[in-house]
């Protein structure tokens, strides 16, 4: 049965409205003019995917005697050599990676760069002073200086080894907590956590993995108590993004905290130096209503039509100039999307899956239009 009047050249899918209970068989046939012919998939047909071999890091053992192994984790893409083809930047997490709420040593985190052929271009070892887990390492891959080759920007520390084998800072530094025995809980607490020590922000060459520029990390940890606890569960919640804050060039924005204090710092890379653009901090007078509004994720988009990107940081939005645009006051959420959800409504809208029951919202806050304080 012919189901469309015209070729599906402008469509990406067909939705069958048949609601019967009998099984349905779908067939796709090649047709030239009025003649139908069968379609055969040859035995040596190319795969619909690339099979890229990976170089798994060696297993390890923590100071407490726990063995661990590695599995591929988050990945990003970028053209690091300017040949017009993407490379894959892959993070390896150890099997003992931890959520921030959990104590324990972790193995070291590795970041690799692979050609689509499987050739390993470089490997960065973030070292013992960068804890492994979903919230700790947000690596940004982009051509920040417009030279046609992508760079990699991420948080580092003493002992990080770049793609050329050079150690950043003090190679002997070990900021991991040995642990404190809690008599009430009858167990060792804080072991493996990193509550002090140097943190850096490093720009790496996407082509070689070489550390091109390193500076003190902003937002800085400071005293973990300033973020709401003493075990770095809140202070070590990291996010990051890439945004066209001036509408022309890409900036990298490093973020810290979302349960209590929130700090965002925007930087521009000119090929030689990482220049601080602005810092937004909820501890600054006037920004208090933006505290406690962060998500486990964020979104970037031009929501007010000024040609510059804003940052949707959970239940609040930071304007392109580093000033607070609005805060809904709805608090922490788990998943957020920014798009034109309602085609009949002008502008972009935000949908946010909240982590707490907020009940029925008043009309002024039940709006999905992100141009105003709504969700």
Model-derived features: positions:
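Repeat-based blade/solenoid architectures
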Residues: 55-74, 127-138, 220-239, 283-298, ...
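Short, conserved, GDST-rich strand-edge loop motifs in beta-rich repeat architectures
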Residues: 90-108, 155-195, 252-254
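Acidic/hydrophobic-patterned starts of short beta strands in beta-sheet-rich repeat architectures
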Residues: 82-92, 146-156, 246-256, 305-313, ...
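Beta-propeller blade signature
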Residues: 107-117, 173-176, 196-207, 264-270, ...
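Beta-strand-rich domains and repeat architectures in extracellular enzymes and scaffolds
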Residues: 53-99
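Recognizes extended acidic, P/S/T-rich segments that occur
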Residues: 1-23
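Extracellular fibronectin type III
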Residues: 31-48
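Beta-propeller blade termini
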Residues: 73-80, 137-145, 149-151, 239-245, ...
